[in-house]
Structure formats: structure tokens, C-alpha cells
Amino acid sequence: MQSSRPSDRQLAIVVSVAVGIVVAVITTATFWWVYDLTLGRAQREAAQTAGARWSPSDGIKVITSSPPVTPTDGRQNWMGTQAWNEGVQAGQAWIQQYPNTVNVQVLIGMSSAQIWTYMQQYVSGALGVGCQYCHNINNFASDEYPQKIAARNMLRLVRDVNAEFIVNLPNWQGNYVQCATCHNNAPNNLEGFGAQFINSVPPIKVTVDPLDANGMAILDPAQKPEAIREPVLLKDAILFYIYNYQVWKPFDPNDPESGRGSLALTYDGGRTQDQVTINQNVMNYQAWSLGVGCTFCHNSRNFVAYELNPAGDNVLNPLYAYNKLKAQRMLLLTTWLAENWPRYGAIAKPEIPTGSGAASRYSYQRLGDGQIYNVPGCYTCHQGNNIPLASINQANIPSGDAGIVVLPPQIRGR
């Protein structure tokens, strides 16, 4: 009778496999333990920081932890703890001397103390600069620096963007833009496009055939805007649509073919392959900017549709149609910004900045007055979040006097 006892060779194999499994488990556990000690916690903390809502303390920390600067245009240093303290002390002295406002043109109706609190926390903090960046702190009413004129006009910009584009969004969720929404603790050279756009869009040339006001393709180069009469790099074609978007058939819930704009792939013979490529990459840029996929705005079985109340269970995101309408409104916003940027006090640049502290070249546009400006794009505010982390929701604005210094009613747009 044959023995059922395993042979020595079989036992050796079993023991070897068991030891191997134990060693593999211990090695893997040790690796992840060491990884967590060295990198894991830091990465988790970085992720939490990246996903945290903006706070005025973020910008104030940038100011107080930075080295001083040496202005050459007559302004005083605005960075560092000393500059911050000097600005705070000067502001406190000013509101004691002038409890009623002097030379206030936008935040009319607020007291000097209210304006001072708002400016210190939500303007200085938003831009990551001390009071001296815009003000002669010996005379806060003075308009001697162009940065103050620009800031005043930017308050008008916040008001008008909220009024014209934000509070009347389809399915508005109560979010407003504020200074920090664009600035995120930096006064200028704001990045409008981001690493994914810069690194992922291929360096190929395409022919842009824009649509006219009737939704018909313009094929004659002589009839096109000068910037796109010849083939251009795909990145520049994307920029053209970000800053030159129109709606030629406004949305009507009773018309399934409405809600069509510059990026529509028309049914009359279709568009060229170049136009499809441009369209796809504009969508990619928006998706990268918001940190979302196609179904955030689209029904994947019918990309053209707007179904405000979709039936059935085959729609991943039942609010997608509202998001699609919002995205169209945001393209109208970036177009409006490019058209109106100079009149809101933006300071032109003699040339596109390069080197340390500059944004990518795509963040600078030569506008209608022939000058170069740092113009916002989708990424400027969103930075990978479908709701910008530096926006502010009405639920977070206290009622009554306390809310006035968080987001003044004068710039909420309603």
C-alpha cells in the first residue's frame, strides 16, 4: 500500500512556499510602513491642503513669511512681517482719524472700519500682498499708485461678474466670486492653463473654421479673424475659442437642437477633422481645469442633448445638463473678460513675462487695444475643482453687519 505521507521533497516545497509568502508579506508591509513614515503622511497632508477651502489666513501667511521687496516706483515694501505690521498700524490709525470714508467709490455705504476689515482680510489676504502694494499708507485716500486704481476697478469687476454671470447661473448653488477666486494669494502673473494643458496638447497645426452668427462654418480665410487665417498650433486654436465664444442658437428647453455655440459640430455635412480635434481639446482643457470627466456636463449616449430632467437610470449625473449650460455661460464669461479686461483696470505688460514668477505664455493675451495682459482662463479660478476653492458660498456669509466685511453686498451682484 502506497503511503499518503508527503515526501521530503514535497515538504521542502511546501515549506519554501510558506516561507516565501511570509517574507513577501513582511517585506511589503515593511515597505509601506517606511513609505508612510517618509512620504505617505506628507503626501496626505499636501492633498488635504490642496483640497482645502481658501482662507484669508492663507494670504496673510504668504505676506508675513516672505522676504521684503524693493519697489522702484515710489511704493514702500509690501512683503514680510514688518511691512504687514506697519500697514495694519497705519490702517488702524487711519480709521480712528477718519471714521467716515474718504474717496471711496465702490464700497459706498460702508464705514471706514468695515472697509478696513474687508480690505485687510479679503483683498490684501486674497492677493498675498500688504497694504503698501496699492496704498500710500500715510494717506489711504490717495490715488497716486496705478495699483490702487486697478484694485478699485477690479472690485467693479467682481460686482459685474457676479451680477452678469454667476448669480443667474442655471441651478445656481449660492457661490460668489471674490478677489481670492482668481488671485489665490498672488497679485499678478496668474496661471490660466496649468500643467495638463501645457504638457498634454500635442504640438500640431490645425485649420480653424469658426462658425458665424448663424452657425455656418467660415471657410474663406479672408473672412476669418486675422489670428486664424493661417493654420495655427492646436494650443492657440484652443485659446481662440476660450476667448472668442458665442452662442448662435440660445437654449430653449422645447427645442432639442438649441443651446448651440461656437464649438457645435453642425449636422450640415459635419465639421472637418481639425475642428473635431480642436473641439475635443477645448473640452479636455475644461475637464482638466475642473477636475471632472465628460459626464459631468454630457450624457455620453447623446453629447448634444440638454435633458434638464433626464428619465431612466442610465444617466450617471442627473444634473449634467445644468452643468453643460453653466460651462457655456463660463465660455461667454472668458470671452467677455477678454473683451473688457482693459476697462477694468488691468495693467498692461510691455511683453510676455518669462522666467521666475511668470505664468505660461498662454496666460497672456494681446487684446483689442494692442497691449498684452494677463487674462484669466478656466484654470485660473478652478485649478482642478468644479467649484473654485476660493469662491465663497452664501451659506458662509454671516447675516447682518458681520457679513458686510466678508463679502460686501455692493459686489455680490444682487
Swiss-Prot record:
Name the domain of life: Bacteria
Please give the GO cellular component terms listed in this UniProt entry.
periplasmic space; plasma membrane light-harvesting complex
Report the principal subcellular site.
periplasm
The residues listed in the UniProt record as binding heme 4, with positions renumbered to this chain, are C378, C381, H382
Q: Which residues are noted in the entry as heme 1-binding? A: M110, C131, C134, H135
Database matches in InterPro entries: Cyt554Puf2C, Multihaem_cyt_PRC_cyt_su-like, Multihaem_cyt_sf, Photosyn_RC_cyt_c-su
Glycoprotein listed as a keyword: no
Q: How is it modified after translation?
A: Binds 4 heme groups per subunit.
Binding-site list for heme 3: M283, C294, C297, H298
Q: List the disulfide bonds.
A: none
Q: Which UniProt keywords apply?
A: Electron transport, Heme, Iron, Metal-binding, Periplasm, Photosynthesis, Signal, Transport
Q: Where is the signal peptide?
A: 1-24
Q: Name one Pfam family in it.
A: CytoC_RC
Q: Which GO terms describe its biological process?
A: photosynthesis, light reaction
Residues given in the record as heme 2 binding sites: M154, C179, C182, H183
Which compartment or compartments is the protein found in?
A: Periplasm
Which GO molecular-function terms appear in the entry?
A: electron transfer activity; heme binding; iron ion binding
Its annotated function is as follows: Serves as the immediate electron donor to the oxidized BChl2 (bacteriochlorophyll dimer) that is oxidized in the first step of light-induced charge separation. Can also oxidize low-potential substrates.
Q: Under which name does UniProt file this protein?
A: Cytochrome c-554
